[in-house]
Amino acid sequence: MANIVFKLSDKDITTLMSRITFDTENLPQGMKARAKYQNTTVNIYQSGKVMFQGNHAEAVSKELLPQHSQLNTNKTKKKNMANSFLEQTLMYDQFNCIGSDEAGSGDYFGPLTVCAAFVTKEHVPILKTLGVDDSKKLTDTKIVELAEQLVTFIPHSLLTLHNEKYNIQQAKGWTQVKMKAVLHNEAIKNVLEKIDSSQLDYIVIDQFAKREVYNHYALSDIPLPKKTKFETKGESKSLAIAVASIISRYAFVTYMDQISKNINMTIPKGAGAKVDVIAAKIIKKYGLSHLDTISKKHFKNREKAQKILKPL
């Protein structure tokens, strides 16, 4: 299945929407309109990007957007291929892969989120055109923009371990490594249920522990051990991991924004001194018990925040 993406102006989008009938209701977040035309799906996103999906995507795009040359898209792809990130991803991107990654493990506030995503060889050109990259290099705004598009066509499983459950498991003796191993394994199994596993070449996990440690903590066997690889700095080696990273980061960022709105304070990410100050303010205004519902209790920030309040 071919995938073609264009970045259009508001005027061009209006013109496109006048040419065929689009649905504008009950759409995924981040999508403006969707249409089915000549066995091709046309998705218009709030970001201004338009995606054509289907075996006739190129022909339909030329018909509906005659003013846009596919040559420009090809030039963009060649430029993207030249950058270092895409050169590094070449090995895994020649195969159909499930990638998995997590977000929030180093942050005092917010949950632990894990995503597994299935990226095929056919997905690779569109992901490069969209600008999928290592999430650590992307702003939160860009992560939200990308994730809201990715979830509409990439088979994936997103799991969130909220703070209250996280703290319960940690009190039982679960380390972060065990939590991540369990969540990664479950997310991968969930994706395998959504796809034809005979089409899968590799499962690539962004390595947070060696294989034997992962196996020890995962509670269940790795689904396809012979196809499973562990990669350090996996986001720079596999687009499947990069996609999983973006979606898991999106879930974490969205949750953090919601916490900030709920308590009317801007909640900082990470576990630095700014976090200590905000945690102290939350204790003073809402109490320690409320702080524990939105944070990871075993982090040193909790103790530091309490010390900040002692002189007051």
Curated annotation (Swiss-Prot):
Its EC number is 3.1.26.4. GO terms for molecular function: magnesium ion binding; RNA binding; RNA-DNA hybrid ribonuclease activity. Residues 95-311 form the RNase H type-2 domain. Keywords: Cytoplasm, Endonuclease, Hydrolase, Magnesium, Metal-binding, Nuclease. It is an enzyme of class 3 (hydrolase). Manganese or magnesium. Binds 1 divalent metal ion per monomer in the absence of substrate. May bind a second metal ion after substrate binding. Belongs to the RNase HII family. RnhC subfamily. One of its GO terms (biological process) is DNA replication, removal of RNA primer. GO terms for cellular component: cytoplasm; ribonuclease H2 complex. Gene3D superfamilies: Ribonuclease H-like superfamily/Ribonuclease H, TATA-Binding Protein. It catalyses: Endonucleolytic cleavage to 5'-phosphomonoester. It comes from the Bacteria. It holds the Pfam family RNase_HII. PROSITE patterns: RNASE_H_2. It comes from Staphylococcus aureus (strain MW2). A divalent metal cation binds at D101, E102, D206. CDD domains: RNase_HII_bacteria_HIII_like, RNAse_HIII_N. InterPro entries: RNase_HII/HIII (IPR001352), RNase_HII/HIII_dom (IPR024567), RNase_HIII (IPR004641), RNase_HIII_N (IPR024568), RNaseH-like_sf (IPR012337), RNaseH_sf (IPR036397), TBP_dom_sf (IPR012295). This is Ribonuclease HIII. NCBIfam families: rnhC (TIGR00716). It is found in: Cytoplasm. Its cofactor is Mn(2+); Mg(2+). Endonuclease that specifically degrades the RNA of RNA-DNA hybrids.
